[in-house]
Amino acid sequence: MKYQLTAMEARVIGCLLEKQVTTPEQYPLSVNGVVTACNQKTNREPVMNLSESEVQEQLDNLVKRHYLRTVSGFGNRVTKYEQRFCNSEFGDLKLSAAEVALITTLLLRGAQTPGELRSRAARMYEFSDMAEVESTLEQLASREDGPFVVRLAREPGKRESRYMHLFSGEVENPPAVTDMSNAADGDLQARVEALEIEVAELKQRLDSLLAHLGD
């Protein structure tokens, strides 16, 4: 995988991809615009608090690596930045609108289930149903120039597996939960419920005894 983004680089690129689609009238972004986007409290996981100098350093590095380019033409006294990460004129990475929406949401929020991705990516692309989300994820996971996402083992107690992007390197994938561990969890839950019932019965008997003594 030739893409190796740090967490801050992934946040910067994710923000530019997002704003290119959701607020095209404000795109490309100035340094201040990128700082604000990176530090948003909504649709970000984790929430970051990057300084202007930290963001500027990421922008400079990404420009050198040809993932971004500066825009400072006539009438633009402030340098602005636009992404060349995907779908640029001379770039190799070509993604559909659906793929851009999923990749952007993964860059901004980390590992997520298909259901979470569908709802969170809705401002960028309206998926017709869950089948379209899952088929797009599978395409990203099996592309010849990829893979760009990976399906993680399902977590205990969760109905859906999560997916994660691979633009920051390989993802540590925990082993799938075995039936034995599920059985152990079920046994523990049953024991806890039995103890709760026993405590409730003891409390009821104590209340009854205290009421009797009061008489």
Swiss-Prot record:
Keywords: Acetylation
Residue numbers bearing the N6-acetyllysine modification: K80
Pfam families: DUF480
Family, similarity comment: Belongs to the UPF0502 family.
Keyword GTP-binding assigned: no
Name assigned to this protein: UPF0502 protein YceH
InterPro entries to which the protein is assigned, alphabetical: DUF480, WH-like_DNA-bd_sf, WH_DNA-bd_sf
